[in-house]
Every structure is written in C-alpha cells, then in structure tokens.
Curated annotation (Swiss-Prot):
Residues 265-270, 326-422 are cytoplasmic. The modification Phosphothreonine is found at T403. This is Gamma-aminobutyric acid receptor subunit alpha-6. GABAARs subunits share a common topological structure: a peptide sequence made up of a long extracellular N-terminal, four transmembrane domains, intracellular or cytoplasmic domain located between the third and the fourth transmembrane domains. It is a multi-pass membrane protein. Keywords: Cell membrane, Chloride, Chloride channel, Disulfide bond, Glycoprotein, Ion channel, Ion transport, Ligand-gated ion channel, Membrane, Phosphoprotein, Postsynaptic cell membrane, Receptor, Signal, Synapse, Transmembrane, Transmembrane helix, Transport. The gene is Gabra6. Alpha subunit of the heteropentameric ligand-gated chloride channel gated by gamma-aminobutyric acid (GABA), a major inhibitory neurotransmitter in the brain. GABA-gated chloride channels, also named GABA(A) receptors (GABAAR), consist of five subunits arranged around a central pore and contain GABA active binding site(s) located at the alpha and beta subunit interface(s). When activated by GABA, GABAARs selectively allow the flow of chloride anions across the cell membrane down their electrochemical gradient. Alpha-6/GABRA6 subunits are found at both synaptic and extrasynaptic sites. InterPro entries: GABAA/Glycine_rcpt (IPR006028), GABAAa_rcpt (IPR001390), GABBAa6_rcpt (IPR005436), Gabra-1-6_TM (IPR047024), Neur_chan_lig-bd (IPR006202), Neur_chan_lig-bd_sf (IPR036734), Neur_channel (IPR006201), Neuro-gated_channel_TM_sf (IPR036719). It comes from Rattus norvegicus. The chain crosses the membrane at residues 244-264, 271-290, 305-325, 423-443.
Length: 453
C-alpha cells in the first residue's frame, strides 16, 4: 500500500498541471481576444495612421518565387512574388502576454492598409487557394507586417535595335494610388541591395539570363499631387543559342552554297540558274520566319541587317551568273563575225563550162556522139571543127563562190568574272562577319535603367 502512494501523488500532480495549462491557454486566448476587441473598439479603418499629422512610412521588400516567362511580342513579363509591407499604426499598440500576434487574413479587412498598386502592371492576381494567401502580424508597438502572394503581369518596354544580342531592364513600379507623398512615402525595408531577393532556382528562363536587379525610387507629378514611386529593374540578357541554330547558321550556309555556283562550268546554264533561284528563295523564307518571334517594330534590328547582307550576297551571285552568261554570248557573236571575215575566197566554177556542155552536145558531129560531161575549166580536145567555133564564141561569165563551213574558235573555259568572284565573294563575306560579330559582341547592349533615389 505504501508503494502505491507515490504513484497516486504523481497522477494527481499531472492532472493538476494539465488543468492549470488549460486554464492558462483559455486565459491567453481570452486575453488576446479581449486585446483585439479593445484595439478595434472605436478604430476607424478609413483613416490612415497619423491622419492630419505625421507622414505614414511604408517599408517594402519583395521575394521572387518564380520569374518568367518573358514575351518579346507582347513586351511583357510574368512573375510570382511575396510582396511585403510594414508600417506602424499607433492606434494598435497593446500590452499583453505576447509581443507578436500572428493573425489570419480576416483581421486585414478591419484595419487600415496601404492602397498600393502596380503602375506598369497589366494584370495582377492575389492567390486565394485554399484560403487567401495573406500573412498578418501585429507587434506590441503597433508595427504591422502584411504579406501577400501575387502573380504580376507587367509591361517591359524593349528597344530591339541590338536583337538578338540585346539586354533589357524590365521595371516593376508600385506606389500609393490615392495618397500623395505628403501623406504616404515608401522606402526599402532592407536597403537598396537586399530588399529584392531572387533565388537562382527561381529565375530559370529559356531565352534570357537574369543577371541581376536594381532598385530605385522617384517622385512623379500629376494633377492630383506628387507621388512616390518605387521601381525594381530586373536586368535580362538574351541567350543567343536558339537564334544561332535557327537563323544565323542557315543564312551563312545559304550564302556559301550560292558561291558554289562560281565553280560550275559557265555552259551549265540550268544548274547555275537552279542554284541562284533556290538560294534566293531560301533567304526569303529565313527572313520571314525570323520575324515571327518579334513584334512588328518599324526599325531594323541587328538580325535584320545580317539577313539583309546575306540576301545581298545571294542575289549578287545570281546577278554574277547573268553577267557571265551575257558576256559569254557577246564573245561568241564577236568570234563568229571574226571567223566570217577571215574566211578565204572560195573556189569558183565558171558558168562557161555549163554553157559549153550544152553547145557541144547540140553541135557536135553525130559521128562522135560526144556525151561526156565537162566538169572542169580544162576541156578535152574535140575533133569537131564546130566545137572550136563554139568555144571561141562562148563568153566568160563571173564565177559563183562556194562557201566552205566556218571553223569557230572554242568559247569554253572559265570566265574571268567567275575567277574574280571565287576570291572576292568569300573574302567580302568573311570580312563582313568579322566586323559584325566584333561590333555586336563587344558592345554593351544592356539597356540603362534610371536609378533616381
């Protein structure tokens, strides 16, 4: 029996402690509820803290959970963030069992909150699954921490002159919608270097590298007063891999293919014509497809200049063959005229012979019956005396020339234009590429962001 007494005392003590804890918990919750009720009693959430007196300072910082995608055609970007705001409301000071009260989003609607909006935002979404994603904490000195999870779709002006070697500074601008700077000012909670956090795993983009971010603040004037605007610039550098594979390499290969025609015989007109027309059509297709991923801007980009020069080289190769063919035909006609001029006088056949044949057949003595045809200038001796008279009476007529076939000089071989083109075209294209890539790769193409503090 004595052995059971310690166990009984232990059980009684544990039950007593649990009862005390339950009483303390109930007292704590009742105390907090009473504190909140007292704070909200007579509280007007239509008035900002310090209304009619001091300026309300709202400290902000941003944590980016996901950055992207970035659209060049629409000139916009999307990101998910935790947007944090901190301010002090003297009306919410309290003394109680805890220094910080962690409350849910229902408390937000009962107190004053800043009317922050995103000036360059096209569409912003506050997440509500499974409940509104909002964090609310109240410190004993009246300081409030208010955090929201947002998806922001914001405008990003882009100057695409250096595309695709370009960089952009995409801004995110926010401030008060109704309160001028005489009533509300915004500041960076952790300073300009650490107030915006972008983890490396949150910025994996397909076409860009997020190389950093900068913050600034500025004051703008409008008809309703001066407002403080906070700005975050996200610096993006474009990746060139896609465009090297899809645009630049095919253009270079097409130009090289067009220059292969310089090594084809100039007599092969169909082959060289097919080369020229095919490469021109290929360049046209490439130039059209390259524009699909770009907005319809009114100026030429760096890629447009490259495609235009490649198109000029391809078209020049086709014009070069036209020139070769023209001068080849011109040379052939000239050689034909020279051959006709240099031809020797033809061997003549006298018409006297033809007349003589007829006379001899008619007037010859029937005794001899001369039927042999005379086909040369030298006549055989005819025993008839009348034949001699016929010869003496036959007039000598001018001869008719017999033109022998012309022997034209060969026009084959390599044209001098082709010989020069085999050297000039590759050298010129290589020089253009050298200058083009040196200029754009060594150029600072990142857009400059304004950093007015």
């Amino acid at each position: 029996m004595l052995l059971l007494l310690p166990w009984l005392f232990s059980l009684l003590w544990i039950e007593n402690a649990q009862a005390q804890l339950e009483d303390e918990g109930n007292f704590y919750s009742e105390n907090v509820s009473r504190i909140l009720d007292n704070l909200l009693e007579g509280y007007d959430n239509r008035l900002r803290p310090g209304f009619g007196g001091a300026v309300t300072e709202v400290k902000t910082d941003i944590y980016v959970t996901s950055f992207g995608p970035v659209s060049d055609v629409e000139m916009e970007y999307t990101m998910d963030v935790f947007f944090r705001q901190t301010w002090t409301d003297e009306r919410l000071k309290f003394k109680g069992p805890a220094e910080i009260l962690s409350l849910n989003n229902l408390m937000v609607s009962k107190i004053w909150t800043p009317d922050t909006f995103f000036r360059n935002g096209k569409k912003s979404i506050a997440h509500n699954m499974t409940t509104p994603n909002k964090l609310f904490r109240l410190m004993h000195n009246g300081t409030i921490l208010y955090t929201m999870r947002l998806t922001i779709n914001a405008d990003c002006p882009m100057r695409l002159v250096n595309f695709p070697m370009d960089g952009h500074a995409c801004p995110l601008k926010f401030g008060s919608y109704a309160y001028p700077k005489s009533e509300i000012i915004y500041t960076w909670k952790k300073g300009p270097l650490y107030s915006v956090e972008v983890p490396e795993e949150s910025s994996s983009l397909l076409q860009y590298d997020l190389i950093g971010q900068t913050v600034s603040s500025e004051t703008i004037k409008s008809n309703t007063g001066e407002y403080v605007i906070m700005t975050v610039y996200f610096h993006l550098q474009r990746k060139m891999g896609y465009f090297m594979i899809q645009i630049y390499t095919p253009c270079i290969m097409t130009v090289i293919l067009s220059q292969v025609s310089f090594w084809i015989n100039k007599e092969s007109v169909p082959a060289r014509t097919v080369f020229g027309i095919t490469t021109v059509l290929t360049m046209t297709t490439l130039s059209i497809s390259a524009r699909h991923s770009l907005p319809k801007v009114s100026y030429a980009t760096a890629m447009d200049w490259f495609i235009a020069v490649c198109f000029a080289f391809v078209f020049s190769a086709l014009i070069e063959f036209a020139a070769v063919n023209y001068f080849t035909n011109l040379q052939s006609q000239k050689a034909e005229r020279q051959a006709q001029t240099a031809a020797k006088p033809p061997v003549a056949k006298s018409k006297t012979t033809e007349s003589l044949e007829a006379e001899i057949v008619v007037h010859s003595d029937s005794k001899y019956h001369l039927k042999k045809r005379i086909s040369s200038l030298t006549l055989p001796i005819v025993p008839s005396s009348e034949a001699s008279k016929v010869l003496s009476r036959t007039p000598i007529l001018p001869s008719t020339p017999v033109t022998p076939p012309l022997l034209l000089p060969a026009i084959g071989g390599t044209s001098k234009i082709d010989q020069y083109s085999r050297i000039l075209f590759p050298v010129a294209f290589a020089g253009f590429n050298l200058v083009y890539w040196i200029v754009y790769l060594s150029k600072d193409t990142m857009e400059v962001s304004s950093t007015v503090e």
